[in-house]
Swiss-Prot record:
Organism: Mus musculus (Mouse)
Residues of the ZP domain: 276-519
Record's bilayer topology term: Single-pass type I membrane protein
Disulfide bonds: C17-C58, C85-C107, C154-C180, C207-C229, C442-C498
Full protein name: CUB and zona pellucida-like domain-containing protein 1
Coiled coil regions in record: none
GO annotations of cellular component type: membrane; zymogen granule; zymogen granule membrane
A UniProt-annotated Pfam family: Zona_pellucida
Signal sequence region: 1-19
Alphabetical GO biological process terms: cell adhesion; cell division; female pregnancy; trypsinogen activation
Stated role: Localized to zymogen granules, where it functions in trypsinogen activation. May indirectly regulate cell motility, cell-cell and cell/extracellular matrix interactions.
Cytoplasmic compartment segments: 590-607
Transmembrane portions of the chain: 569-589
Lumenal topological intervals: 20-568
Length: 607
């Protein structure tokens, strides 16, 4: 009888756990731990409305015998808006328990629609609520899917300055259980304007079922611009050069979906023209309002190579590669410059006369010390307008694990042993294949500001350290190796700074082709294409075993010996202080003993 009673109690508990998935607990703590799915292979999806009370700690597990992944979507979350994410949140775990890897967390302050995917056939999510009484509600939709199943035209990368896209099957009904992501990325200096020319999805006040989520950035964790459903033709704008659009559909009520187009808007003010140079291209921006005043339009523009066309939005942009589109490279006194020409093609009404101004824009990028200088001048009927701005070389300095220079060291700081061989590579990021990198000077310092002391590894292209080895010229890469060391009387950190020279590989008299010049027989300041790169810190491991094998062992011992007199002084001072404390203590005790003797009771004399 006792066994039967226990079974009856367990049955009541099991029923109450399952009922909580679709019922509301107005007061008190609900029993909300349950297992979902797994029993019925025909059940591929499920929608739940969870009503939660205060002070809950609920856990649900989704499982399925078939080896398929799970996608769970929290399309509507109503938690206590005044709670902190640490005390009231939703956590999703990859696996059949909360001990699995955490896929992510959501709370009332999240500015995105939480969507998570498992790596296998099980997933667990946990909801914890705070002590405040508040009507909480969460809408959850999950389904099983196979990564091998692909829906055509469902998402993609859009890189042009303008374009269009639509939901799968548009204008026919969209597919069920679709999750499509479009990443829109335009050029730097632009923002994106997205227009929905047609939109028809399942209508719902909170867009819980079929919806579009538009994010202000390159991923679904960027700020949510808007969650859309129903009908309409909204227009949205990003704050940067990236935008992400998501379409999520459930298992019922499919409509025709959406059609959208986007354009790019240049965010900077351009009165007439502007020029900028980077390591691999020149970028010319021409204001659209500048051309009508001269009776031209964008179709009249061309570069030296007329097949290279501009991108047109609210401005006209030429992105000119340094070794394409008719760009002319010039070497003069070892200085490298790149020049191209934008001309306005006239459509004359007569072969004899014209009433249009003859206009051309000449753009030049010249390499300068630690930078590039951009020069632009416009000729308009013998009138020359000059413009110039400054930029920097795009170079980097990095550590690699071996002399193959394939595996980049990602750690920062990088912990090494004394005397360990380190491999360093300087990289020039440019599209010009004829440029070559030369390591002129590489210097080490225990501090990032490279104040004294410093130690030269390479000077004037020559190794100054016995463990240093400079590799031969290799295109856009300058490489060398050396053995790790430490600075005496400093922390075990080392920073590296290298001065890099960039030359034309065809210039046989350039500094790069001279190699090591010990006595500085050339004038480095006359070379304009020069830049600095810094890396660090490199730190020694706490293991001292490498120090015993290092050639720096005598120097380390010397540093320890030099500190011994100072240690003896500290010991002597401590002994004197201790002796003074003892003397003061004895004097104090003696004083109290004397006072006690003076105040003892004495026998009175009898008269």
């Amino acid at each position: 009888m006792e066994v039967t009673g226990r079974l009856f109690i367990w049955a009541i508990l099991a029923v109450s756990c399952g009922a909580q998935l679709n019922s509301t607990e107005a007061e008190g703590k609900s029993r909300c731990t349950a297992s979902l799915g797994g029993a019925n292979l025909g059940e591929t999806h499920k929608a739940l409305v969870l009503q939660l009370s205060a002070n809950e700690n609920c856990t649900w597990t989704i499982e399925r015998p078939e080896n398929r992944s799970i996608r769970i979507i929290f399309s509507y979350i109503k938690l206590d808006p005044g709670s902190r994410c640490e005390t009231e949140n939703i956590k999703v775990f990859d696996g059949s328990s909360t001990s699995g890897p955490l896929l992510g967390k959501a709370c009332s302050r999240n500015d995105f629609v939480p969507v998570f995917e498992s790596s296998s056939n099980s997933m667990t999510f946990q909801i914890v609520t705070g002590l405040t009484k508040f009507p909480r509600s969460v809408f959850i939709f999950y389904y099983f899917f196979s990564a091998a199943t692909v829906i055509p035209n469902c998402g993609g990368d859009l890189r042009a300055l303008e374009g269009s896209f639509s939901s799968p099957n548009y204008p026919k009904p969209h597919p069920e259980l679709a999750y499509c992501v479009w990443h829109i990325q335009v050029g730097k200096g632009y923002k994106i304007q997205l227009k929905f020319t047609d939109l028809l999805l399942e209508m719902d006040e909170n867009c819980k079922f079929d919806f579009i989520a538009v994010y202000d950035g390159p991923s679904t964790t960027a700020g949510l611009l808007k969650q859309l459903c129903g009908r309409g033709k909204p227009t949205l704008e990003s704050s940067s050069d990236a935008m992400t659009v998501v379409l999520s559909t459930d298992y019922a009520n499919s409509y025709k979906g959406f059609s959208a187009s986007y354009t790019s808007i240049y965010i900077h003010d351009v009165n007439t023209t502007s020029l900028s140079c980077v390591s691999d291209k020149m970028r010319v921006i021409i204001s659209k309002s500048y051309l009508p005043a001269l009776n031209y339009n964008e179709s009249n523009l061309q570069l030296n190579d007329p097949t290279c066309r501009p991108n047109v939005s609210n401005v006209i942009e030429f992105s000119i590669p340094l070794h394409e589109c008719g760009t002319v490279k010039k070497i003069e006194d070892h200085a490298i410059s790149y020049t191209n020409r934008i001309t306005f093609i006239e459509s004359p009404v007569s072969a004899v006369i014209t009433r249009q101004k003859l206009l051309q824009i000449v753009v030049t990028c010249e390499m300068e010390y630690n930078s590039t200088v951009e020069i632009m001048y416009i000729t308009e009927d013998d009138i020359i307008q000059n413009q110039s701005v400054l930029g920097k070389y795009n170079t980097s300095l990095a550590l690699y694990e071996s002399d193959s220079f394939e595996n980049l060291v990602q750690e920062s700081p990088y912990y090494v042993d004394l005397n360990q061989t380190l491999f360093v590579q300087a990289t020039l990021h440019t599209s010009d294949p004829s440029l070559v990198v030369f390591l002129d000077t590489c210097r080490a310092s225990p501090t990032s500001d490279f104040a004294s002391p410093t130690y030269d590894l390479i000077s004037s292209g020559c190794c100054q350290d016995e463990t240093c080895k400079v590799y031969p010229l290799f295109g856009h890469y300058g490489r060398f190796q050396f053995n790790a060391f430490k600075f005496l009387k400093h922390l075990n950190s080392v920073y590296l700074k290298c001065k890099i020279l960039i030359c034309d590989n065809n210039d046989q008299t350039s500094r790069c082709n001279q190699g090591c010049v010990p006595r500085r027989k050339r004038d480095i300041p006359s070379y304009k294409w020069k830049t600095d790169s810094v890396i660090g810190p490199i730190r020694l491991k706490r293991d001292r075993s490498a120090s015993r094998d290092s050639g720096l062992l005598p120097q380390i011992h010397e540093a320890e010996i030099s500190n011994q007199p100072l240690s003896r002084l500290y010991l002597f001072s401590f002994m004197v202080l201790a002796l003074n404390v003892v003397i003061v203590a004895i004097t104090t005790v003696k004083h109290f003993l004397n006072r006690w003797m003076d105040h003892r009771y004495q026998k009175l004399q009898v008269y």
